[in-house]
Amino acid sequence: MKRLIIALFSAMIFLCGCNQKPTDEAQTVIKFSSWGSRTEYNILKQVISDYEKANPDVKVEFIHVPENYFRKLHLLYASKTEPDVVFVNNIYAPLYIKAGLFEDLSGKIDEGEYYQSALDCFKYDDKLYAIPRDISSLVLYINKDLIKKPQKITDIYTLEAEAKKATKNGVFGLNYEENPLFWNTYLGYFDGGILSDDGQRIIFGETGSIKGLQLYADMINKDKSIPHKWDMAAMTSAQMFIGGKTAIYLSGRWLVPKFNETVKFDWDVIPFPQTKTSKTLVDASGWAISKSSKHKEKAIDFVKYLSSEEVSEKFTETGLITPARKKIAESEIFLNPNKKPRNSRAFLDALNQSKPTPVNENYLKITDEITKKLENVFNGKKQASEVVDQKFVEKLQKHCN
């Protein structure tokens, strides 16, 4: 009898064990880091849950860093505790690629399914180091109550004129953050910029760059159509647009959900004007894999899921991104005419004549020095040509050698 009880008990344990999910010891743990808003966080948590259900032998450890993401990421790499899968943008990517920290992902996806500009944001020496989730181009958000005929804005001078005309009664014609990401559009219009396309030469002192900088500064100090920092008090540029204090606002797709929730007036978007030779600067975010990962095959499989059409649709539905996948970008999910902005195609039209923001591993050091140097240009105390002299350009060039 005793033997029978033991046998039955053993059988029960065996049967129960057959129905159990893999234990933590049997699972491969993949560490995945990302920044992101609450909306993005919620999507990622669901995406991870779905992936784990389909792949019970994998556990994804999600490292969500809502602020100071890259500072945290630097520390993780320095302490040899880096994630297997890393969400990254093209501005910071060179730091990790040049240091040999990212895996070459060439051949892991069908590149024909993606916008070339998005792929180029993560390509170095013809190798792909991250799979793009989105591609970001800057457009002009228009307060249609204040700008009745936005179609008149066909070049940078008609933009200047419309902004000047709209500046009255406490309203500024144009606004955006005083950051290289935004004012660089002015330089690009005149075929200028900060760095050459290969990131090896400073072009900040060239004629087009100086011309674009000065036009931007003149709109602040002469036309008074762009506010000084002190004109904004404690408001952000986005808050000024939401409050009807700005007629035209230069920014990216990420503000669409916020504007849909808070803006009370009629609004839409149009492309930032271009010449026949100028190119819109674009940026991208995507998923990379640490070269040191001990679970590369699992990590690659997870990244393929993150970059799938199914997941791309989830992010696109929020309005936060312009998807890097062409099929999703051209679908009604993104181009829905019943949702604002009704002219979402403006984000895609900008890609027809575009290039990635030229960067190198020292790009942030370069822009930090430029930002400090330009204060007297933007406050009207000096001309751009006085401040951006040969000596300053040579100083910046040291970050390229």
Short names for language-model regions:
Residues D104-Y114, F172, G192-L213, N260-T262, ...:
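Short, solvent-exposed loop/beta-turn-alpha elements that line the ligand-binding surface or hinge
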Residues S33-S34, A93, F182, Q214-H295:
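Extracytoplasmic/periplasmic substrate-binding proteins
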Residues A161-A166, R201-W230:
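Glycine-centered hinge/linker elements that transmit conformational signals in sensory
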Residues A93-L101, S117-T154, E177-D198, L281-I289, ...:
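Periplasmic solute-binding protein
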Residues L75, P83-D84, E111-D145, F172-Y176, ...:
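A structural signal for short loop-to-beta-strand junctions that line the ligand-binding cleft
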Residues F122, W267, E317-N376, N401:
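Long, aromatic- and glycine/proline-rich binding clefts that accommodate carbohydrate-like moieties
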Residues N89-V139, I156-E162, K168, D268-I270, ...:
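Hinge/lid segment of periplasmic solute-binding proteins
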Residues I5, C18-L95, Q274-T277, E297-K298, ...:
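Conserved N-terminal structural module of periplasmic/extracytoplasmic solute-binding proteins
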